[in-house]
């Protein structure tokens, strides 16, 4: 049933981050869907051209794989066999998946937006970038144009964040691990003691980048993550899950990337944020205050690169924007592990909700870094 057949509903669009799934199944699902969607097929063709054009502008070998592939499916197939995580490839594939899901969703439901009323948008980490397009695009043509422009911006943001991380520690490896069933306050105290005891310089210190009531994700250079997880008695005894992030994000102690270079001067930047759209900041749990796409992207880049991602406040912020008297449809723009938290919060608040998967994919693959020396 398409959404135009559902009366009086409130929509919540959810865009997950780049760590949430093996990229190949979701790209394959999009590729299959494009066989019956000319617009999605055109977007996927445009996506590889944009990625290759942006790659050619780089002076280094960053993203060189993109220049040797004829489409995003080939990129995903090659990356699925990779032994080491590559944040540029992983993030770009995840972004293509989110933008592609948005194109597909709007192609199916074009012309029905007025019947569904206000739309709430939740994006987690780089998922916010696709959410920005959803907040500004009033029709399928605008969706298509803005996805292409913001994909280029997103590519440059990933390059900037990877460069910032490699300037701290150039060796490949994972920059994060997630601790289960430990409070943020307790973990912060342990991290402060750890950083002080090992006399780590500010840029190499371990920090909490993502927090929730049930788990917290700690970021640090790969050598530090390796030592904490395997050789430090306090942390190695804690329940933890390897997290597929290969760059530092949500890092308030690091320098802000060059926003002017990242955003550039594309024509769609002056597109206004639509009055019936609300996109939640993952650091404040409140709607971003932005009049245009450019202003929104500037705030989103700060949330991704500098600000703590608070899962619980984001989910609560979404629920505060909703009318309890009306049913809720959650549109999953690809897999997101945070949808169960949202559905629980809605149920606790007395909402009736249903989740529809626009596109689906596998659960995360677990990549383990190679053994490295102690910091």
Predicted regions and their residues:
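Acyltransferase/transacylase module recognition
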Residues: 1-118, 252, 256, 260-375
């Amino acid at each position: 049933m398409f959404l135009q057949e559902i009366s009086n509903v409130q929509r919540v669009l959810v865009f997950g981050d780049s760590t949430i799934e093996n990229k190949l199944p979701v790209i394959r699902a999009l590729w299959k869907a494009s066989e019956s969607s000319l617009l999605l097929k055109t977007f996927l063709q445009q996506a590889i051209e944009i990625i290759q054009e942006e790659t050619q502008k780089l002076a280094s070998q960053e993203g060189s794989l993109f220049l040797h592939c004829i489409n995003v499916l080939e990129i995903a197939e090659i990356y699925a066999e990779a032994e080491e995580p590559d944040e540029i490839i992983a993030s770009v594939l995840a972004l293509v998946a989110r933008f592609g899901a948005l194109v597909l969703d709007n192609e199916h439901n074009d012309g029905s937006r007025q019947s569904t009323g206000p739309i709430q948008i939740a994006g987690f980490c780089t998922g916010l970038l696709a959410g920005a397009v959803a907040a500004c695009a009033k029709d399928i043509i605008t969706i298509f144009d803005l996805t292409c422009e913001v994909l280029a911006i997103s590519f440059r943001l990933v390059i900037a964040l990877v460069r910032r991380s490699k300037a701290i520690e150039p060796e490949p490896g994972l920059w994060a691990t997630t601790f289960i069933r430990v409070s943020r306050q307790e973990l912060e105290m342990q991290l402060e003691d750890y950083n002080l005891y090992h006399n780590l310089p500010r840029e190499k210190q371990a920090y909490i980048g993502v927090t929730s009531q049930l788990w917290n994700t700690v970021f640090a250079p790969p050598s530090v993550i390796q030592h904490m997880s395997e050789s430090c008695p306090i942390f190695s005894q804690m329940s933890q899950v390897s997290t597929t992030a290969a760059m530092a994000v949500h890092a308030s102690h690091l320098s802000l990337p060059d926003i002017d270079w990242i955003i550039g001067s594309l024509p769609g930047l002056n597109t206004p944020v639509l009055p019936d759209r609300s996109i939640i900041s993952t650091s404040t749990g409140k709607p971003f205050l932005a009049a245009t796409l450019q202003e929104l992207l500037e705030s989103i880049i700060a949330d991704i690169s500098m600000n703590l991602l608070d899962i619980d406040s984001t989910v609560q912020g979404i629920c505060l924007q909703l009318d309890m008297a009306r049913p809720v449809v959650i549109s999953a723009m690809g897999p997101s592990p945070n949808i169960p938290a949202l559905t629980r919060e809605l149920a606790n608040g007395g909402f009736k909700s249903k989740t529809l998967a626009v596109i689906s994919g596998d659960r995360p693959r677990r990549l383990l870094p190679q053994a490295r020396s102690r910091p």
